[in-house]
Amino acid sequence: MKKTILCLVVMCLFFTLQHVMAARLSDEDLAKKIEGWYPTGLPLVNYDSDNGFGYGVRAYLYNNGTRDDEYFAYAPYKMQLYGQFYQTTNGYQYHEINLDMPYIFGTKFRIITSIAYDKKINANYFGQGADTAKGKLTLFTTYPTAFERFDTYQDYLDYADKDERYLKYYNYKYTKPSYFLNVYRDITQNLKFLIGLEVKKVTINTWSGEKFDGTSQETTLLEQLQPLGYDGGWSNFARAGIYYDTRDYEPDPKTGYLIDYAFEISDNTLGSDYDFTRHTVQLQYYLPLLQSLTLALRAGYTDANGDTPFFELGYFGFSLNRRTGLGNNRTLRGYREQRFVGPTMTVANAELRWKFAEANSWGQNFQFKITAFYDVGNVYDKAADPFTHPRFGDYHQGYGGGLVIAWNMATIVHFYYGMSKEDSSVSVDFSHTF
């Protein structure tokens, strides 16, 4: 009953509170913003350290409206619709249709909705929790008392090349068809509110006993540990969030800040097989050092409580987008995807973004930026541990740089190379890390 009353109160606030308009584009960027409908898109020919060489296409359709529109100077676009077909040589598929409409039909609401099919036959599972994250990679062999430990991921690969029975020891397979709908509303000039729902069916399989390159695989780490979620199932959850946003332009900020809190709840009333909650907070800050040079900073924290399946532990549930962590191009570059996972995770990122060139041709605007970054993150077992037992010496660090291209300001393509003491990573993908 209390949950029902709380939901009703939240919905009443959501639909009745008034606001004024959001942060405005600079005059320089406003002059570059084109009017009306236009397409963009790229063939997806890229490489990712976790997923191998990828190929496919992502096509965008934008509508910016006209300069006379009330929200032209405030919204990143009037509508963004994209469709994606993508698969890789390492067995990853991600196909999606996504629609984003800020100030939909001239109202103060925004909707983001997506339907996606996500399949991976080499998803990573390195264990979970603080002890696992701060220890060495450990491979338990077929004998219960025997194990191998590795200082780096490359050391493990060298071992597995010699004993191919363990090539898939840290891998498993999943399929995740999903749908989500997020509805946002401005409360004040910069304060925004979110309610949303995600529905996802997860199917899990292991490599144990199957053949890879003709070699039968030994029992994998996932099968040895059999964490909650090992059998897959429905993972449905509702979301609510509130954030304060003064950024000048959401896809590619140069100034301003974002303070964000989001709450997620999953239980059987939503048709979920799991009962858990998640709290996530983040701060983003953008400081223009020079006209063409921006310092971008982010700090994030997330905590999951209850019966959280292992495949949901590795997420930061930010209001505008959920990000996998810790590892790969969305949180901790220089490490494998979801290399460090636990109930409580922290992340911090610093980037320098320098626009060194700009070109205009056939009515299209292209901006080219060099970026240098430094990332850190850690895993904890309890919500208060980052503050009461921070273990600063255990923070994992990654660094590197790359190229970012902004196409008509709204379509962001990045080329990152990240390094760490354990591994390196390459990423060619859309959007900034933050």
Predicted segments, located by residue:
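Short loop/turn motifs that connect adjacent beta-strands in outer-membrane beta-barrel proteins
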Residues: A23-Y38, G65-K78, I104-I111, T188-F193, ...
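Hydrophobic, lipid-facing positions within transmembrane beta-strands of outer-membrane proteins
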Residues: P39-G41, Y55-V57, Q93-I97, T175-L181, ...
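Membrane-embedded beta-strand positions of outer-membrane beta-barrel proteins
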Residues: G41-P43, L81-G83, I111-I115, I195, ...
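Structural signature of outer-membrane beta-barrel channels/translocons
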Residues: N46, Y62-N64, D100-I104, Y184-T188, ...
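Sequence/structural signature of outer-membrane beta-barrel proteins
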Residues: Y62-T66, Y86-N90, I104, D118-N122, ...
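Extracellular loop and loop/strand-boundary signature of outer-membrane beta-barrel proteins
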Residues: G83-F85, E164-Y169, E223-G229, I265-G271, ...
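C-terminal outer-membrane beta-barrel translocator/porin domains of Gram-negative envelope proteins
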Residues: L222, L228, S235-Y243, R247-W362
